[in-house]
Amino acid sequence: MGIDKRKNDHIYLASSDLSQVGTALFEEVVLIHNALPEIDFSDIDLSTNFLGAPVKAPFGIGAMTGGTELAGKINAELAKAAEEFGIPMYVGSQRIALVKPEVRWTFEVVKQNAPSIPKIANLGAPQLAQLSEKQLVDWVVQAVDMIDAYAVAVHLNAAQEVVQPEGEPSFRGVLEKLKIVKRAAGRPLIVKEVGNGISKEVAAKLAEVADAIDVGGLGGTSFVAIEGARAADAWLQRRVAETFKYWGIPTAASICEVKSVYRGFVIASGGIRSGLDGARALALGAHFFTMSQPLLKATLEGRLREEIEAVITEVKIAMFLTGVRRPQELAQVPRVYGPRLRAWLEQRGTTC
């Protein structure tokens, strides 16, 4: 199956409920209500920084797509909204545009429609692992130029690759390749998961190279489930995808794991379905959060701006009801954890 067909499959499946698996455990994070907040709602200021760049909210558009005509239209709409709201935006994996230059435009529309916001390039770890240093540097330079990227993300998607019919489960030497990416990019490096989470052991290894870790935890879009749904004629892929679709670290737990060993910038993603979930992620210690599936679905339904406005409003309400004026103050809000998250933290020897 061609990579362009695969990209469109991912769009339709990711926007459907079939791709949504497990729980991110945000329902296990209760922010204590402040009946006497001693602030006005108008006092709340969501502005913050994203790896040093000023942005209007601690919220961004997560990695989604690129490489097909449909993907290009989606990216253009996402970019326009990101520019309007002053929030960062990831693009989807740029590999397709690096091997098929005729589809570069599906990514270039992002810099054309969002000239001033931080844009994040996106490359896959298994592909980088197979490139020579010269080829890798060339890919990084092209990916950055394609969208005028402020930062570069490398996604870790071992679970997806090992169940994907066309997968490339090649991860030997990735850590060394990340160092090359950082040197070649000359800008912040984000290392991210795509729905299975990052443990404290992996975060400790990434500390030497990553300027930011995006936890990409379990509880939202599952690329394992997506690949299983795509594998209509491949019984083995369907079988193993069904077996492993709940594999991973829930996002709330992953934030805590990463924060316990990593002092860099932490981005929460995976199963964040509202501004309240985003506020919970910030309370756990994340500096920023992103959403993908709800925004993809909203784009396809013609209500993207309404969805972004709702998320931003929900974050502000959560801040008002906990009595904080700035996003970073959410980390000081008293909270109670449910039994599943508490048990995870205890067994892993992690506090949050």
Curated annotation (Swiss-Prot):
Pfam families: FMN_dh (PF01070). It comes from the Archaea. Keywords: Cytoplasm, Flavoprotein, FMN, Isomerase, Isoprene biosynthesis, Magnesium, Metal-binding, NADP. It is an enzyme of class 5 (isomerase). It is found in: Cytoplasm. GO terms for biological process: isoprenoid biosynthetic process. Mg(2+) binds at E161. The keyword Manganese does not apply. Its EC number is 5.3.3.2. GO terms for molecular function: FMN binding; isopentenyl-diphosphate delta-isomerase activity; magnesium ion binding; NADPH binding; oxidoreductase activity. GO terms for cellular component: cytoplasm. Its cofactor is FMN; NADPH; Mg(2+). FMN binds at A63, M64, T65, S93, N122, K192, T221, G271, I272, R273, S292, Q293. It catalyses: isopentenyl diphosphate = dimethylallyl diphosphate. Substrate binds at R6, K7, S93, Q94, R95, Q160. Coiled coil: none annotated. Involved in the biosynthesis of isoprenoids. Catalyzes the 1,3-allylic rearrangement of the homoallylic substrate isopentenyl (IPP) to its allylic isomer, dimethylallyl diphosphate (DMAPP). Homooctamer. Dimer of tetramers. Belongs to the IPP isomerase type 2 family. This is Isopentenyl-diphosphate delta-isomerase. It comes from Pyrobaculum arsenaticum (strain DSM 13514 / JCM 11321 / PZ6).
